[in-house]
Amino acid sequence: MDELLEKAKKVREAWDVLRNATTREKNKAIKKIAEKLDEKRKEILEANKIDVEKARERGVKESLVDRLALNDKRIDEMIKACETVIGLKDPVGEVIDSWVREDGLRIARVRVPIGPIGIIYESRPNVTVETTILALKSGNTILLRGGSDALNSNKAIVLAIKEALRETEVPESSVEFIENTDRSLVLEMIRLREYLSLVIPRGGYGLISFVRDNATVPVLETGVGNCHIFVDESADLKKAVPVIINAKTQRPGTCNAAEKLLVHEKIAKEFLPVIVEELRKHGVEVRGCEKTREIVPDVVPATEEDWPTEYLDLIIAIKVVRDVDEAIEHIKKYSTGHSESILTENYSNAKKFVSEIDAAAVYVNASTRFTDGGQFGFGAEIGISTQRFHARGPVGLRELTTYKFVVLGNYHVRE
């Protein structure tokens, strides 16, 4: 049996045990994982150093190297995520609602794990930990298929995780990692309906669309983030600058970073020179529409290709718009449904924007960078969903469950 089938079978078998594990047993497993990550910190960082060096040798751009790179702070964040998830309420077994029929038949809707989950992701090794601990806490086993860029990092992390599980009641095979980086395995994996209940792709548009279009296993589509910020004419321009800088530059390689800036034409002459200068101070390449270039002539001309593009880099495209209606129409045309923000002091415009923009997260006077499981209070996240079914936005513990009906009778028969 090849590696993929063998490990898929293992996670399916382990799920029969894990789905009935107690909250105490699951929390103990996650606590052990945190301890092992700390204990194996040196080995993980050494493995990651190899991946980072190889990426730089291949000329990978720095924003993507940043997604790949680990350091002590990021290991600490993984450990903190474990501690956070331990503290979260276990959704499994929750009675969502219940009722009693006139004949005394009792019906309850009870939250249960989804089942073995396949995760296909690219260059972020922290995903290995975040997805694992959320899966375990929600009673789901997990089959991981990371990108070749992070192979050494992921192997070191999974080794620590499996060592931790061996010291607990949770089966070691609750977490399996596919070491073979052959891309043809992705197609095989997303068709393993016999073993997997759900597949979640985390990565760029190419990966996500391939999985969505070819899978026979149900897919939870995590999103490409072509995120916009609209600066309305009533916005506090002094306060708007740090919001835009945060949204674009804090971590430009993430899906919740701002990629486009829309500016109301009535404030464009005043605001554009200020924000362009500030963006450039932070190393951002600024592209702009014709109206933007009339005000700041030395920005790079934006083309039609720019508007739908997720840069994942220190690049932003600016468009001057007539009003909130034109901003909304532009976003409707080019948005990926991830995160969209308006900066305004006008209540009516804020209400209109929130009502008409169709996205997983819509912001008023805040950075798009908050679309994140940790920031929303879910602990870690297994991805950010841009679809409307079965989950939307940051996918936390509750979104990794489904439900079943438990029906209690007294030898009832249907008339």
UniProtKB/Swiss-Prot annotation:
Pathway listed for it? Amino-acid biosynthesis; L-proline biosynthesis; L-glutamate 5-semialdehyde from L-glutamate: step 2/2
Disulfide bonds, paired cysteine numbers = none
Q: Where are the transmembrane segments?
A: none
Superkingdom to which the source organism belongs = Bacteria
Instruction: Give the enzyme's main class according to its UniProt record, as a single word.
Output: oxidoreductase
- Supply the EC number(s): 1.2.1.41
Q: Which UniProt keywords apply?
A: Amino-acid biosynthesis, Cytoplasm, NADP, Oxidoreductase, Proline biosynthesis
Xref: Gene3D superfamilies: Aldehyde Dehydrogenase, Chain A, domain 1, Aldehyde Dehydrogenase, Chain A, domain 2
Q: HAMAP family under this entry?
A: ProA
The UniProt entry, under NCBIfam families, shows:
PRK00197.1, proA
What this protein is reported to do is described as: Catalyzes the NADPH-dependent reduction of L-glutamate 5-phosphate into L-glutamate 5-semialdehyde and phosphate. The product spontaneously undergoes cyclization to form 1-pyrroline-5-carboxylate.
Q: Give the family per the record.
A: Belongs to the gamma-glutamyl phosphate reductase family.
Protein's name in the database: Gamma-glutamyl phosphate reductase
Q: Which organism is it from?
A: Thermotoga petrophila (strain ATCC BAA-488 / DSM 13995 / JCM 10881 / RKU-1)
Q: What is the lineage of its organism?
A: Bacteria, Thermotogati, Thermotogota, Thermotogae, Thermotogales
